[in-house]
Amino acid sequence: MPSKQIRKQSVILTRGARKREEDSGTDVGEGADDWAQSKAAVRPPDQLELTDAELKEEFTRILTANNPHAPQNIVRYSFKERTYKLIGFVNQMAIHFSQVGNLIPKDSDEGRRQHYRDELVAGSQESVKVVTSDTEILEEEEEPKEGEGEGEGEAEGEAEAGSQTDVPAAAETTEKVIEEELMAPVQPKERKLTNQFNFSERASQTFNNPLRDRECQMEPPPRTNFSATANQWEIYDAYVDELEKLEKTKEKEKTKTPVAKKTEKMAMRKLTSMESQSDDITKVTQAAKIVERMVNQNTYDDVAQDFKYYEDAADEYRDQEGTLLPLWKFQNDKAKRLAVTALCWNPKYKDLFAVGHGSYDFMKQSRGMLLLYSMKNPSFPEYMFSSESGIMCLDMHMDHPYLVVVGYYDGNVAIYNLKKPHSQPCFRSTSKSGKHTDPVWQVKWQKDDMDHNLNFFSVSSDGRIVSWTLVKSELVHIDVIKLKDEGSTTEIPEGLQLHTVGCGTAFDFHKEIDYLFLVGTEEGKIYKCSKSYSSQFLDTYDAHNMAVDAVLWNPYHARVFISCSSDWTVKIWDHAIKTPMFIYDLNAAVGDVAWAPYSSTVFAAVTTDGKAHVFDLAVNKYEAICNQPVVAKKKNKITHVQFNPIHPIIIVGDDRGHITCLKLSPNLRKMPKEKKGQEVQKGPAVEIAKLDKLLNLVREVKTKT
């Protein structure tokens, strides 16, 4: 009974204690909640208050490899140049933590070798300890024990006799153990080999030792004054003396036969004669070139006088008419019966122009030629290059006038360097480098790219306009745009649609807006395109009913361009208006058109009937002020025309390979007349205003109609 009461009391006590703990816990918890609710955030008075939208706005963080703590203006002294130079490249590497480790994985070959070596070392140490402990025990047993009396009697004598018998046996065992240890072969330490298949390299940056100049004193070398003349005969005599010395040394040698000596002498004589001939030929060619120019100057002296000074006096009696005076005629027998397919003046040498020869008869394609003529020598070209395929177009670089880019009938493009004498192009496209699949109709040099690499564009009948860049002596191509006829599509039985590809024939880039250019096609349409957009055209003009032969921006007015076609028409456009401003019918297929460099209203066109037409909109807006046949035979077709950038002359080429130079009469190049007390205004602004005045009249008429 008493034990049961004790148990009941303990249970009651424990229940009461638990209840008190729960009550105390609830009180503390409630007090903690009240304290947490009454807590307020402390904010500074100038803190920004952002809205929910601003708080939810995400900001992107960009990680860069640049070290913000790296110095930007390090200047070091260059002992080589003896000046302080700014260090352009600064090391951007920042090391946060570096530790050299010496741990080796246990499973690797090196770890196993090291574990094996440690075991060998530990085993040898234990064996030495065992031997030393045995010897120490034996020595202790040999020493007499202290505290023993001297008078022990017979028992002591027997013990000593027994110990004396045991000592030699123990000594023999220790000596055997030591001999075995010494006679055992010592294993050499295994050399640590590097793992050729699992290793890491650690790079370190070392400081380049600066160059230092060290001076020392020495005796000056002896000096003598020497003077001699170096000319052709002195050099020849020196070579002859050297040759005689060689012959004397060969005569002393007895091993060689006299026949071998004679052959060597003949070979040496041939080499010296060939060298002298090559030097003489180069000098003769230069002298012959000078003499040829002198002879031509005397032969064509009357033509040169007309080119420089003659002015047609009959223009005073003709108000709105002019004439073309024939000057020189350029032709070459090697380019006979090859049509003139391209003309271009050199931007630096104004008397030099390039001619491309090919064939417009596509059923009878032949070779091509690139010729460069000078007005100083009309009888023979200055440079001559031949090609297997016909040349269809060319252009000369503005900054590098010795570089000529050409386009071939087979779709290739090539660059010729006039400084190099060989006849092959320096750079040429191939089928692997993205050449055109149809004839290349026009090429144009453009500004260099960001890396100062040469750059030019080409257009072809395959519908591609390609940008070519000369990178590391190689032509790299990029398709800028592909011409697609938006209106015409053909359906395939499978349900697919094929877009008709436009055939590009001509293009021209804007003089001020670098990315803007025009493209003419065989379908008669003109597309306004941009270098930045390769998928669509900026504008489309339904210009002609037949192929567009040429399209050119006006050299003065930024909004005006001209086009000509085989449909007998020449049209002048404002690129902001889809209808032409002026239309001229020339009663024959127009092969080419060109703006005059001296006026914004003058242009020339050539037709297949052998006539050249010169227009001046400021004089007559409706008709040409000069219609003149410039080829002898009616069957000859004029293909191209070009104005000289400085002189008042034009050059025209026909399909027989002839180039004719013509001088413009004063009525074809009229300038503003001087008025009393007023200065004549000149410059691009005057030319722009003159053309704007004509265009405004046409715009007013169109708005009224």
From Swiss-Prot:
Localisation: Cytoplasm, Cytoskeleton, Cilium axoneme
Family matches, as InterPro entries: Dynein_IC (IPR050687), WD40/YVTN_repeat-like_dom_sf (IPR015943), WD40_repeat_dom_sf (IPR036322), WD40_rpt (IPR001680)
GO CC aspect terms: 9+2 motile cilium; centrosome; cilium; cytoplasm; extracellular region; glial cell projection; microtubule; outer dynein arm
Region (Disordered): 1-44, 122-169
Modified residues (Phosphoserine): 124, 127
UniProt entry tagged with the keyword Phosphoprotein: yes
WD repeat windows: 386-426, 435-478, 543-583, 585-625, 633-672
One record GO biological process: epithelial cilium movement involved in extracellular fluid movement
Biased composition (Acidic residues): 136-159
Cysteine pairings via disulfide bonds: none
Entries under Pfam families matching the protein: WD40
Keywords: Cell projection, Cilium, Cytoplasm, Cytoskeleton, Dynein, Microtubule, Motor protein, Phosphoprotein, Repeat, WD repeat
Amino acid composition bias (Polar residues), ranges on this chain: 124-135
Keyword Disulfide bond: no
Molecular function terms from GO: dynein heavy chain binding; dynein light chain binding
Protein purpose: Part of the dynein complex of respiratory cilia.
Family under the similarity heading: Belongs to the dynein intermediate chain family.
Oligomeric form and interacting partners: Consists of at least two heavy chains and a number of intermediate and light chains. Interacts with BICD2. Interacts with CFAP45 and CFAP52. Interacts with CFAP53.
Protein name according to UniProt: Dynein axonemal intermediate chain 1
Lineage of origin: Eukaryota, Metazoa, Chordata, Craniata, Vertebrata
Gene encoding the protein: Dnai1
